[in-house]
């Protein structure tokens, strides 16, 4: 037996059916008088609710089956994506660029600095003319943006990431014009100049963004012998000291420690908040062009080096060599800044790599590989064995000498960004040629 509401719904459906199929008015009046004697008792159907008709159960079952199918397809897609991500990650850990370049573009001045955007297919290029270019690496016919950033050559570029508190991404450029400029990156990577950091009295050689707590800081070094730490929020210099007696050409910051290389042919490790010099490496015959703190997998870091966060560094020099060093461990005293160990203040040379035939200009780490470029026109890839760095050998070499001296390199800085690594390597030459190796 049907309930009253069910009978009313059935009767109303019959009348609707006759009406929609153009039944005669006389028939419709007769049906309504018999089936719906109290038409006002019928509550109108809410269009936002599921229809209460006899086929509603069938429709509901069909909808359930459709949703289940969609869920299965989505789960399959997620599983495939995770599998693909794992394959990319595994492939990237031992990735080595192809034998031939993916593309080359020639610009109107020597390329002196390169920097990849950590997530977008964008590369920033600094020229010796002071021009800053922004290119889409998937379409390099024309630059996305060209800015005369400095009055003299750009020497380095560093990029920072936005944070959860709304801080935007920034780009820093240093130059021979004695200035460091800070640029804000919009969501589409468009550059807007926001401030100039003036304080150095000679060429600013290198820079690097790094975080300390919630603060974004920038380290710069210069031919005026000073290394400076800047607070980006207000543009103030919060620390300034002299780690070397000659031109500081390169720096690399890791936490509270900064590694520097100089024209005095030495490299030094300093605790920058206190300015305490901790140890140094002596062995190069000519000025040091580039220094790099080597970040190993956590399992390869010895327990006593945990407070430092690393135990090996690399340096590239005009003597044509790359040296791998083991850092002497400073003394860590609770509630005090670290101090040099009086019994061990000198780095130990682990390996001297001599495959380059001229000045070695730049160094970059990619997982267990070290990339270098030189005035001999070559780019080289070195295989790092963390258990025995003395066995480091050249894994692959690319001869780009027909494009001039190779001044600089860039690839994804995995340790800094924490983002998935991409199979990208770029080299910039003295003749203005950007060479790309993709996959």
Swiss-Prot record:
Keyword Transport part of the UniProt annotation: yes
Transport recorded as keyword: yes
Disulfide linkage: none
WD repeat spans: 106-145, 149-193, 199-240, 243-282, 295-335, 355-392, 402-438
Entry-linked InterPro entries: Dynein_regulator_LIS1 (IPR017252), G-protein_beta_WD-40_rep (IPR020472), LIS1_N (IPR037190), WD40/YVTN_repeat-like_dom_sf (IPR015943), WD40_repeat_CS (IPR019775), WD40_repeat_dom_sf (IPR036322), WD40_rpt (IPR001680)
Residue spans crossing the bilayer: none
UniProt record similarity statement: Belongs to the WD repeat LIS1/nudF family.
Complex formation: Self-associates. Interacts with NDL1 and dynein.
PANTHER family in alphabetical order: WD REPEAT DOMAIN 5B (PTHR22847:SF637), WD40 REPEAT PROTEIN (PTHR22847)
Name the record gives this protein: Nuclear distribution protein PAC1
Source organism of this protein record: Kluyveromyces lactis (strain ATCC 8585 / CBS 2359 / DSM 70799 / NBRC 1267 / NRRL Y-1140 / WM37) (Yeast)
